[in-house]
A protein has these predicted regions:
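Aromatic-enriched
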Residues: 382-491
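Hydrophobic/aromatic-rich transmembrane helices and adjacent perimembrane loops
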Residues: 369-386
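Hydrophobic alpha-helical segments of integral membrane proteins
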Residues: 60-61, 226, 383, 441
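Membrane-interface alpha helices of multi-pass inner-membrane proteins
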Residues: 219-233, 237-243, 357-364
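Membrane-embedded alpha-helical segments of multi-pass membrane proteins
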Residues: 151-154, 198-206, 231-236, 256, ...
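Primarily membrane-embedded glycan-assembly and transfer machineries that use lipid-linked glycans
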Residues: 2-5, 13-220, 247-370, 452-457, ...
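Hydrophobic alpha-helical transmembrane segments of integral membrane proteins
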Residues: 45, 184, 236, 375, ...
Length: 491
């Protein structure tokens, strides 16, 4: 009797455990998207990461101050001087053939007031020149370069931490952030940004932080993205994608509101003739093909023979139709492939779509400078995040290694090469296209492994006793975000 009682108790215990397991699994699978736990409650920048960013800014300042040739920053600074001194009618004076040369006498005269030897015409929003004109009252050009170096060093840390947070949905450990930042500092794309005084680290870090924080800090992420979009037009493509996601829509609306406020402020503070000149300048760049080794866009590589060998970048207005249609057709095809992979990969749907949109907008634009490659940091973290299934366990890291080798190859290094070096103009577009291909393949394999084998982001789900609990543990990891259109099939 005692043995029968013990066996019956054991059977009841097993039934209770099985029932509890089934109830847990049923509740977790039945959870609605709106009831899913927040994916990004942890801060993008913790206090240790903020300290690391300050140290990164200090390191870049000590390493580069007085050792740069900030031609690009000088162009922005001269634009600010023109606005401040009532010479805004000359803000967009540019040579019709040489993209890097100014026209007239006003630009060269003011360019002599800065220490950079090669300034180029202003192409940004005139409101940006207005802001720089105000800054010129409180600091000299040399002081502004020092501040740019410090802020750029901080921005690299923010870029690394925000890219990690976007894909891994947790705060990046500060020690790993410091190590990765040191590696990013050594990349030629970063060296190029610091050397010529580019604002790209600030722009890219602003975009990455805005995307990572768009779920929890709607107003901050939205305002930041709105400001960046007013300076560089590419983020508008990202804002459009964010509107389709319920948890990101509020940040997108904040972005649109910010750009609207800045647009109204521009029409109030800037003469219509200057705004018209800016619109004409942007339209001229978009309708032309900028050919030269410095511009590594696909259109530039297709029209290499049309450029003047003595010019760094030639503005070509008469070109074969295939120079524009081939990049457009490839871009449309990549858009369809990115959308298809995102459809099949709900866990990383937002991250995949937003990173894909960012890559596509930059890869197939009219201009692709070397310092634009800094945005690939976000994609590298995406490849690492999706490398946690049996089909994507090791070889994505081989792809990352190939990408790093490509970006650090001497022909792409601004210290070891120039835009006139053979092969230089192909390095950027090759890196961008390689990254897009890696994202599509890794994303597709990740989706297939999850659907076919049940692999989760915690690793492969074990078989046998306890496999249900292992699956339940996998569900504790980030859940798919609800999205308009993609989720209609589930309703």
């Amino acid at each position: 009797m005692s043995q029968d009682g013990a066996s019956s108790q054991a059977a009841e215990s097993q039934r209770a455990v099985a029932k509890s397991r089934s109830q847990v699994l049923r509740k977790m699978w039945a959870r609605k998207p709106s009831q899913a736990p927040a994916l990004a409650q942890s801060p993008v920048m913790s206090w240790p990461l903020i300290l690391v960013s300050l140290l990164g800014g200090l390191a870049s300042l000590l390493a580069w101050n007085g050792r740069t040739q900030p031609d690009d920053w000088a162009s922005l600074w001269v634009g600010g001087l023109l606005m401040d001194r009532g010479l805004e009618s000359h803000l967009y004076d540019a040579d019709p053939i040489d993209f890097t040369a100014m026209s007239g006498e006003v630009w060269p005269r003011l360019a002599q007031e800065v220490s950079a030897p090669f300034t180029h015409p202003f192409v940004q929003n005139p409101l940006f020149a207005k802001a720089l004109g105000a800054i010129s009252h409180v600091m000299s050009f040399e002081t502004s370069v020092a501040w740019l170096l410090f802020l750029s060093g901080m921005a690299v840390v923010v870029l690394v931490a925000a890219s990690y947070h976007l894909w891994f949905r947790s705060t990046m450990p500060w020690g790993i952030a410091a190590l990765v930042t040191a590696c990013v500092f050594a990349l030629p794309t970063t060296l190029n940004s610091f050397w010529i005084g580019q604002t790209t680290p600030l722009i890219v870090a602003g975009v990455a932080y805005g995307l990572a924080a768009s779920r929890t800090r709607h107003w901050l992420a939205g305002i930041l993205l709105g400001i960046v979009a007013s300076i560089k037009l590419t983020p508008y493509a990202l804002i459009a994608v964010m509107l389709f996601f319920a948890y990101r829509r509020r940040a997108a609306l904040w972005s649109l509101a910010t750009t609207a406020v800045l647009a109204v402020w521009m029409f109030i503070r800037v003469d219509m003739s200057v705004i018209s000149d800016w619109i004409d300048r942007i339209g001229d760049i978009g309708s032309s093909v900028l050919v030269g080794g410095a511009n590594q866009s696909l259109a530039s590589t297709l029209a290499t023979d049309l450029g003047k060998p003595d010019l760094l970048v030639t503005v070509v207005r008469d070109y074969p139709s295939h120079v524009k249609t081939i990049p457009l057709c490839i871009a449309l095809g990549v858009v369809l492939m990115v959308t298809a992979v995102a459809w099949l990969n709900p866990v990383y749907r937002f991250e995949f779509l937003i990173t894909g949109a960012w890559l596509i907008a930059a890869t197939f634009s009219s201009i692709l400078w070397t310092h634009y490659m800094l945005m690939l940091v976000t994609s590298v973290f995406g490849l690492a995040a999706m490398a946690r299934t049996r089909l994507t366990r090791q070889w994505p890291y081989i792809g990352i290694a190939l990408l790093v080798v490509l970006l650090t190859f001497p022909v792409t290094n601004p210290i070891a090469a120039t835009p006139y070096t053979g092969g230089f103009m192909y390095s950027g577009i090759t890196a961008m296209l390689l990254t897009l291909a890696l994202m599509l393949v890794v994303g597709g394999c990740h989706a297939f492994a999850v659907h076919r084998y049940g692999d989760g982001d915690a690793g492969e789900v074990g078989a046998g006793l306890g496999s249900e609990l292992a699956a339940a543990e996998t569900l504790k990891f980030p859940q798919p975000e609800p999205m308009v259109l993609f989720d209609l099939r589930k309703r």
